[in-house]
Amino acid sequence: MAGDAVAAYCDASVRRDIDGLLDTLAPDAELVSPLSGRMVFRGRADLKVLLGAVYGALRDWQWEQQFGEGDMRFVVGRGRVGGLPLDDAMVFELGPDGLIHKVRPHLRPWLGTSVFALLLGAKIARHPGVIWRALRG
């Protein structure tokens, strides 16, 4: 996975290096919420808040092999949240600049995802502007 934005994203997320992770994102990058299809988080400032909360809640996180080529990539991740297993099938869309322009997480199983939603919701609720902008679509 070495040498591209997705590999760098995965490496930074495992280390909880949010600034390093943000370096892999385009300035106008967006993340489509897997918990609420209506919410789309945009821009590095809002993504810093969101991704800090996301990777701060996960334990023993690891990514497996990267699939895809060109501007579409797919990586499977797994770890724990609140002591429960959580898996992610993350789809990344890259721009012509090689940076990540869109992130689409797909989480399972249900119980781990539910606990994750509760933990993440409590952390993100401290930032109502981030929530408001994500809901505006």
Regions found by a protein language model. Give the residues of each.
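C-terminal and inter-domain tail/linker signature
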Residues: 1-137
